[in-house]
Structure formats: C-alpha cells, structure tokens
Amino acid sequence: MALTHEQKLEHQSKFAAATNAGQPDITMSMCVEGALVWHNFDDKSVPYASTGKTLTRMHQAIPNLRWETRAVAATSSGWMWQAAIRGTAPGGEICAHSVMIVTLNDEGLITQLDEYIDPSQLSALRG
C-alpha cells in the first residue's frame, strides 16, 4: 500500500535527525539493500552504503556540522529536503546548499536518493 504524505514526512524527519547526529547506521536501516545515491556534480550513482563513511568523516572533521532545513515536501514517490550544510571546517566556515530527492518503496525504505550540491562549497573541509 502506498505511503501517506504524513508517513513520508515522518521518514524525512527521522532521516534528517540521523544525518544531523552523524548516525549512518540509522540512515542505512532506512534503505533497501542496494539503494543508490546519484550526484548531480558527476552524474554518477554510488551505493548508499558508501555515503555512511562520508557522513562519519564529515562529522569527525566538523564537530558542529548540521543541516539547516530550508524546505521539506512530500512527493508522489517520497520526499524532498532542501538544506544548508553548515559548520566550522578545518579551512573555515562552510555553507553548502543541498537538495535531496528521495524515492521510497511501499514499505517506506529508500530505493534512490538524488543529491544536488556544489562540492566547491565544501572546499573548507580540506583545510
């Protein structure tokens, strides 16, 4: 049975909380095995499992890392999250604008995450 908009928004809220807390184990549990993340900047899809390592590294490098929500919306197939990624990185303050468009299956698990971000806005991560 298809998810309601309320269920989709609850899913997004849990995902955002786990992302902000640096808990990739929780975000992974919200995905089907083999879920993919597509990046706009290189037009490539990677296994969602590899993004957990990136999330962990980012939280280690930026103790005050956070995703400040600008907009959230349920879509016909999942949800959309627009956020500003902020924090104090080794090379200074970061403010990277991000949009994630997530596709959920009928069980409420992520099958696809499309991420739109300009990686140059994260250059301060490299110190």
Protein language model annotation of sequence segments:
Residues S13, H39, T111-D114:
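Short non-domain terminal segments
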Residues H11-A21, S45, A61-L65, P119:
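Phosphate-binding glycine-rich loops and adjacent basic patches that engage nucleotide phosphates
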Residues A2-L3, K53-G127:
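A beta-strand edge to alpha-helix "cap/lid" segment located at domain peripheries
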Residues M1-E33, G127:
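Short, low-complexity N-terminal intrinsically disordered segments enriched in polar/charged residues
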Residues F15-A18, W38, R86-G87:
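Alpha-helix C-capping/helix-to-loop hinge sites
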Residues P24-S76:
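A solvent-exposed, acidic/Ser-Thr-rich amphipathic alpha-helical stretch
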